[in-house]
Amino acid sequence: MKYNRELLFGRWFREDIDDQNRKVVEYAQLSADGSFEFTFVTIATQGGNVKTVLEQVTELGDWGLVADIHFTITKNEVVDEQLYTVDLNDSNNYHAYRVLQLNHHTFEYQHIDTNEIFKMRKVTDNIGYC
């Protein structure tokens, strides 16, 4: 299946619970020029409420979409407000995903190697009135 690349432009959001019962929130900005900014926030919770932010990492790099394959190349990371260049020889900075669903509201994709499935929701700046 072939997906329209323009559908990915903009801001996306997802949250999950990891295997250590921590909340992981991802904010993604995918730009038309092929650049991305992903921010991952790991949060300790207690009784469903935020207890403390454990980690916040921002990744910067390039992305693309060919047919039903979405790929990312991380080039920089921001940790504790410090910008670091990543090792481009490290295969962990390259990821490919099969797109399962993509429309104006939802982006669902599966990692090619790990088979993990992620589902993001589009963040809209415009609130419609009825």
PLM feature spans:
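Lipid interaction determinants
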Residues: 1-66, 71-130
